[in-house]
Amino acid sequence: MIILIAGDTHTGKTILAQKLLEKYKYPYLSIDHLKMGLIRSGQCKLSADSNDMELTNYLWPIVREMIKTCIENSQNMIIEGCYIPFDWEKDFTNEYMKQIQYICLIFSQEYIKHNFQNILKYCLLYTSPSPRDS
């Protein structure tokens, strides 16, 4: 079984992946860790500041083939990140799809309305200052 966890930044993907790892003992891959490993090693010309579409276009083919390899070898894996394309399903046959569970985490308007200050507080904790703030 492959568990794909997608969603925008700060929606809880990593926390959910960690909880699923603890519960099911499945290996866990953060696409962000893969991204930074490739960037820091000089294996790609992208940077941490590259736009999400460029990063998705580069990372998804790698992740997609890792998923297929896991399924072909009857291995479980939790994969989380924001670099999963919206049309990811087109890359898999029905046989592969039977082995993939997809979860997309979002904030509902109601949640945002009632928790806006907390969302803002935590987003600001993890956001680098812009050059204008210097």
Language model segments and positions:
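P-loop (Walker A) phosphate-binding loop of NTP-binding proteins
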Residues: 8
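ATP-binding Walker
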Residues: 11
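Walker A/P-loop
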Residues: 14
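Conserved substrate/cofactor phosphate-moiety recognition/catalytic segment
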Residues: 18, 22-58
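Conserved phosphate-donor/acceptor-positioning beta-strand/loop module used by diverse small-molecule
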Residues: 98-118
